[in-house]
Amino acid sequence: MTRKLRVCGAALLTVGAMVLRCATALAAESSACDRECLHGVMDQYLAALVAHQPEQIKTTADVKFTENTNRMKLGDGLWQTIGSLGTFKLYIEDPQSEQVAFYGTVKENGATALLGVRLKQHAQRLSEIETFVIRQASGVHGTFDNLTTVPAEWDQSVPDAERSTREQLRHDANQYFNGIEQGNGKIVPFAEDCLRIENGAQTAPTIATASRPSMSAGAQFDTHMFDYIHEITNRRFLLTDPERGLVYAVVMFQHPGNIKPQLNSVAATAAGAAPRTFSLSSYPNTTQIIETFQVRGGKIHRIFAYVSLLPYRQSPGW
């Protein structure tokens, strides 16, 4: 009799454990933040930012907040000076990692600035807040006022047959940075129509001028015009969205200042192009890039980036 009671008790404990596991799984599933939820999390953050009310944000006890790589108290920095949000709003959501990123514009004391935000959520509270503010007086190129509406292509789903895995998306983005370092566009899976926008300005394909021809992104790499970028460090591939073919990365371009860019392709020479002098190649500096790639059918079709200028070898803060 005693043995039967023990067996029965053990069975009940097993069933109880199974019920507990199921309840835990259901609770986790119900608290998971999907694409729409993450979009809302970002909107709540932006609304609090514009209202200058950081107390509206639910954070973990050990939340980390940075602006332009500098760690600071939530409520400092742009929280003090922002006026309003612009109309350009590009969102990247990654439910698997519970992260959402945002590219937009803001008004700050009457001037247009670029705003990038990355949020990571844990247990329905923000645990990571990484922000980027690029101001027109900061010495970087760009046409900020070009950014008014997000092209529809960024919100289109990739057909199942043309989708890449999360690992493939990160690999393709990493090859882009390898191609810059090596001066080799052939190792990067560029689509023929690849379009690159940096700080609101179209940088690939370039627009032909009297001193240089129009060049695709891959052709630019082959000319070694980016040799002044000695290395690309602290590569972080933080969000991936296979449904839309997006991968979001944050990297640091290191410019030692003693390497001059050259245009040495046959096409460039034939068109009478001369070596170019980039201001960023004239002195030691670092640029932090937040860059999103759109990949379809294994090819990079679109690249969107915000570029900020920092002191040489500045820590990324993460």
Regions found by a protein language model. Name each.
Residues 21, 25-318:
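C-terminal and inter-domain tail/linker signature
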Residues 1-12, 20:
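Bacterial N-terminal signal peptides that target proteins for export
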